[in-house]
Amino acid sequence: VERAGWLMQPPPGHDEFLEWNTRIHGLTARDVVRAPGWSAQLPALTAFAGDDVLVAHNAGFDMSVLRRASEATGDECPPYAYLCSLQVARKTYDLESYRLPLAAAAAGFLDFPHHDALADAEACARIMIDAAERHGAHDLAALADTLSLRIGRIAVTEKANV
């Protein structure tokens, strides 16, 4: 699993750091004041992701963030394919809760700094790898098929010609 992480300034109008969000992820406006913005970093993100299927826990939310950030900046969001590790965990493990730390623990990934984006991404990857091994799937498409899940695709809107 390749790893990459970076901070970026949120798009204007989406750059308020609410106290309850900061309590969750620990980031403040001061942390990103010198970071490049979404438009400047989107090429690096797309180069890193390539044509891979993206994975996130409650992936629909994360994909909407990618789409909305692109819309807010006038950038074109790639129509990434994605699979949700929460859905995979629900069909793989018998847990009282499928929150990321518990699902990751079921996959053998313990004691990570939850809500650290890079650590959360690695936890999702570990869930997918463990689930694929348990179900005898050789890739994410086979895993989705085995579990009767659909690989989603980010719904993108055409850029307006202004």
Model-predicted segments: where are they?
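Conserved non-catalytic scaffold segment of RNase H-like nuclease domains
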Residues: 1-79, 94-97, 101-111, 115
